[in-house]
A protein has these predicted regions:
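A basic, amphipathic helix-loop patch mediating RNA/tRNA/ribosome contacts
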Residues: 13-53
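A detector for short, charged/polar N-terminal pre-domain segments
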Residues: 1-11
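Short, Lys/Arg- and Gly-enriched loop/turn segments at beta-strand edges
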Residues: 66-70
Length: 70
């Protein structure tokens, strides 16, 4: 499992931006496509909100990839 550290003073990152920053997708359009196709899970549940706020402690999963926000 990867760890993703939020920036100092940042409370959250949007789901589509996180999976793009982690390199799991190449573009924002692909991120939207993957979320719309119910391929992304947050804390074990399928997530369809593109702008879902990922906060410290949340675990995001895509295929065999997992990351925890710190």
């Amino acid at each position: 499992m990867e760890n993703f550290k939020l920036q100092e003073g940042e409370e959250y990152i949007e789901l589509k931006n996180l999976i793009k920053l982690l390199g799991w997708v190449n573009t924002g359009g692909e991120a939207t496509f993957r979320i719309d196709n119910k391929e992304i899970k947050v804390n074990g549940e399928i997530e369809t909100q593109r702008r879902k706020k990922i906060r410290r402690g949340d675990i995001v999963m895509f295929g065999t990839n997992q990351a925890k926000a710190l």
